[in-house]
Amino acid sequence: NYIYYFLVAKYMADNMHCKTGVDNIMNLCENIHDDQKANILIFIAHHIKNPQFVEATQLALMSALDNQKPVSLSKDDDYYKLLNEICESLKQEIIKPTEQIDPEKEREKILKRRDENERLVSNEKVNPNSLPIEIQNMNKSLRSIEVVGQIVKNRQGSLPKPDIKTMVMEMYGAAFRTIGYFGAIIESEREHVVEDVINNKNEGASNNEIIKKIDSFFELTSLNFCLFVFSKVINAVGSKELRSTFSQIAEEIGTPAAKLVSFSIISCFSKIAIPELEDLVEDLRDNPVAMSIIRARVRSYLYNNHVNFSDRQKIINTVNLNPRDSHIVANKPSRKSR
């Protein structure tokens, strides 16, 4: 598949100087919800520096779910209300106090799970145009994020910094609209699901118990989808060279969601600056949803990076993972890193 995508992308990039070539690129952008077309666009991004290509992919990104209100994860946000209860219950997630952690092994586990998931997805042959329109709309947005992210990564040294910043901000916007779109679907379907389950229930469980379990399912699904979309942005555009850009965007957008994405990117691709973490926690301390995501991100950071004992203690205390973590040991260095 990769050889096919590479050759098709090279051919299309070499022929973009003519009208037919431009039309072909535009067709790919209009049908970016199709995985095959999106993959070709990602490969084209390796070959081409044509401004028309950059503009076409940006347009696809900006137009994706453009009528949808983006999530903010502020307390008055509808999506926040979907997540609040389950995030309250996750407050006590901890890192085991005496656990020896090998970051290399932890990263290997993550990569293995990712490969398994990709293999399962690649084995499923589905006509993208036969999927429900809601799925197509979300796929268009998510695939646009991947393509524009590839352009940013490839051309961060040649494109003007304001252009890079604009493109990344559009990626944030598309991600937040996608999450909002999913939340609207969840809200619209919840009552139908509750009604169907109650009407077809077996004796035993009360209606209140059923509603509670369904609500928990929707809350967990909503949280997982939010983190999934955040991870799309992180993987698409993550780069330690753009650290200052991510910080600027978080400040300009100003929402908890933007601050969480920027913090997540920075912690994935460079070292956590403890003063910055302290400022973020101080800003979002009263937001259980944001704090739950910060703790999850910090936990991942500590499991996947070598962090000395002193910094580890400061980070744990800053996010208040658990009082018992005052005795946590530093990461165990692997033989390879000695």
Give the residues covered by each predicted segment.
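Charge-dense, extended regions
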Residues: 166-174, 180-338
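Hydrophobic repeat-domain scaffold segments
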Residues: 2-6, 10-204, 229, 233
